[in-house]
Amino acid sequence: MDIFNILTMIGGLSLFLFGMNIMGESLERRAGSSLRALLGKLTTNRMLGFLTGLAVTAVIQSSSATTVMVVGFVNSGLLTLGQAINVIMGANVGTTVTAWILSLSGIEGSSLIVRLLKPSSFTPVLALVGIIFYMFLKDSRKKDTGMILLGFATLMFGMETMSGAVKGLKDVPQFQQLFLLFSNPVLGTLAGAVLTAVIQSSSASVGILQALSATGQVTYAAAIPIIMGQNIGTCVTAMLSSVGTTKNAKRAAIVHLMFNIIGTVVCLALFSLARALFHPAILGESATYLGISVCHTAFNVICTAMLLPSGNLLEKLVCRMVPDARQPEAVAELDERLLTTPSIALERCRTLTGEMADTAALALGQGLQSLLDFSPELSHSVREDENRTDHYEDILGTYLVKLSALQISEADSAEAAMLLKALNDFERIGDHALNLVESAEELQEKNLSFSEAARHELAVLTRAVGEIVELSFSAFRENDLTKAYQVEPLEQVIDDLKEKLRVHHILRLQQGSCSIETGFVWSDILTALERVGDHCSNIAGCVIDLAHHDMNTHEALRSAQVENENFGEQYRMYAKKYSLKQ
């Protein structure tokens, strides 16, 4: 083996790792909505959690990425430790899918079917289709599909190149001695753990082992301990990601480590015992691509079958290893680790934006109530809720900007932009709730009151504002276009009401039934309520924008009048419903 073989091997390894990386990232983007659906199905059901972990890892081709995601979920309070344990065990089995795909490189034979199954036969076609999709199609999902095909083709080409380059190693005595050394179970396990810890991917390290098996010098006696060690080495990524997290998130990372350590210790003991007592002839045979895939899968399935039923005991063990803090820990509302899976991070942002909307709606409801029946408790509660909406805007705005800077799908990018726009409207509604409370406080402090006619008119307007808030917020939560289109007619009615109330107040001033001081407060209240309607209209516009893939809110609001055939009818219905006639 000369320097050119070494360079070819390095090039093949580089292409292999690069292909695996871009294929995994593209799969993640392409399957974003599916990942969100899987997350939504997570329950305390042990088997469902296990299957979820298996499915997610099979999709994104990385148990490390899944485990880091789980650590982020636990840190954010999305998952309990018990749920996380089930998902982590599923991830360990899901990661074996990659080895089975790579085992296609080891197929040998001259029949037509075998030749069609060999990667060298079909990867050029996949690469051609992939580059056509990527270069000539504009849809981001189709581009991601192209990148998946290109990544897979690059991965398989790198595997073939690496396998061909290492065949010369079979004549190198030092290489033979190295794998003879690794047939020692402890050394083999350490070697597998170190290699995987360095490249931070058990799928990649198993692929490298499969490529090295092409030399014929890798026996099952060496391959099996190395595979066990690879499963321990892959825990490094999750352990590093748990630094600075909550106790439960640290426990989730340690569960991943303990699962693999316990499984390795038990399986290694059984392996050593069987080797000493029975001297199986197969251990001296050269490992194959397929054989390594079988060993990798068997190890993870055995570990899962052994530890899944005792998940509660594993949970108790890590709780003893990482005891609870004396003071309750704050749960991270938005965990940076979730950014490694943008679609999941976006779903978390949507959930928190929904919570922000609930807080703003609560503040506004209390603000409206304070106009009718003021109390210091209401005032204090509204101020707390308004501060909370400010906090939501700060953390979500920063997080969504970071998320938007990542390479995400067109649909996710549009949703992130929609959330960024909606944040400001929810926050401003919280501000206007505070404005209403301040007006109520002024009335209370100065012992002012509105006339009977003014109170009736204000009650009509507040009911209309209450309905538009409920309608627009519901449209946002449910992505309901029907409700979104109903907002603009009601907003027009609110604008008309505000103008009528302003004119009526001027008439009352002229008649002497209202004072100038109450007039200032009246004007402030009308302005706040009218602006709440405007922000609700903007929120509905964001929903329409997202449905039309066009983030021009003003255009969306204009189209709401054009596209909504029932606009005039709905306007008349709302005008009648909120008529000022007693």
Where are these regions (language model features)?
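Helix-loop-helix hairpins and the membrane-proximal interhelical loops
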Residues: 1-46, 145-194, 212-215
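Hydrophobic core segments of alpha-helical transmembrane domains in multi-pass membrane transport
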Residues: 9-22, 53-57, 125-137, 150-162, ...
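Alpha-helical transmembrane segments of multi-pass membrane proteins, especially transporters
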Residues: 13, 33, 37, 41, ...
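Alpha-helical transmembrane segments and their lipid-water interface positions
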Residues: 15, 28, 64-68, 95-102, ...
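Short helix-coil transition sites and intra-membrane helix breaks within transmembrane domains
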Residues: 24-28, 56-65, 166-167, 195-204, ...
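Membrane-embedded alpha-helical segments of transport systems
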Residues: 59-66, 85-102, 119-125, 155, ...
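Membrane-interfacial helix-loop connectors
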Residues: 69-91, 99-121, 196-233, 242-248, ...
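Cytosolic, long alpha-helical scaffolding segments
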Residues: 79, 105, 218, 244-250, ...
